[in-house]
Amino acid sequence: MFAIVDYDTGNTRNLKKAFDYLQVSTILTADPQQLAAADAVILPGVGAFAAAMAALKERQLVGVLQALARSGKPVLGICLGMQLLFESSSEYGEHAGLGLLSGRVSALPTDLNVKVPQMGWNQNELRRPDSPFASIDAAYTYFVHSYYAVCPATEIVATVQHGVQVPSIVQQQNVIGMQFHPEKSGRVGLQQLAAFKEMVSANDFSSN
């Protein structure tokens, strides 16, 4: 059972359908006990960083998510959910994140002859050949975002180019993030969710 964090930000219906296709049962919940009992925690999200963090705080989930991740619970952040895993964001001011990954979230540059937000398909380049997410290499996934993670190279699994090098998958042991929407990325997106499923089943996050 995977628990999808319910904090009123993000389209969870398509994400649930993707896991259904992979024969992974899910529950949409903000109950700390259900999150703790799950095999993995999925943190979705669309919208603004500060509002999302406020929603997590309102539900008293910040400390819960931090404790679960630090106990070894697999955590997957998707789109804004990935950004929340980092230490801070400069979106509409300076805001603290969950601090589960090193780095901060910054605005995509608007002066590099690319459209902001990045909205559409982009081609991934694998940065960690031994990763379970190796099928992402040269494949296209679907993005919708105006901010991106600036983080250590040791956390980066894959990137795309959008004026700057944008981390598309990050991982630090059991904490993983995907900047793209796997549930909107067709077969390739399902492959990445399947890879995460296998990592959870094997309890093997040793690639980082």
From Swiss-Prot:
GO molecular function annotation: glutaminase activity; imidazoleglycerol-phosphate synthase activity; lyase activity
- The residues that cross the membrane are none
| Pathway where it operates | Amino-acid biosynthesis; L-histidine biosynthesis; L-histidine from 5-phospho-alpha-D-ribose 1-diphosphate: step 5/9
Top-level taxonomic group: Bacteria
Pfam families membership: GATase
Domain (Glutamine amidotransferase type-1) spans 1-206
Protein's GO biological process? L-histidine biosynthetic process
**Could you tell me where this protein is found in the cell?**
Cytoplasm
Q: Which GO terms describe its cellular component?
A: cytoplasm
InterPro entries this protein is in?
Class_I_gatase-like, GATASE, Imidazole-glycPsynth_HisH
In short, the EC number is 4.3.2.10, 3.5.1.2
Q: Which residues does the entry assign to the active site, renumbered to this chain? A: 79 (nucleophile), 181, 183
Keywords recorded for this protein, A-Z? Amino-acid biosynthesis, Cytoplasm, Glutamine amidotransferase, Histidine biosynthesis, Hydrolase, Lyase
Instruction: State the reactions this protein catalyses.
Output: 5-[(5-phospho-1-deoxy-D-ribulos-1-ylimino)methylamino]-1-(5-phospho-beta-D-ribosyl)imidazole-4-carboxamide + L-glutamine = D-erythro-1-(imidazol-4-yl)glycerol 3-phosphate + 5-amino-1-(5-phospho-beta-D-ribosyl)imidazole-4-carboxamide + L-glutamate + H(+); L-glutamine + H2O = L-glutamate + NH4(+)
Quaternary structure?
Answer: Heterodimer of HisH and HisF.
Q: Which HAMAP family match?
A: HisH (MF_00278)
| Protein name, as recorded | Imidazole glycerol phosphate synthase subunit HisH
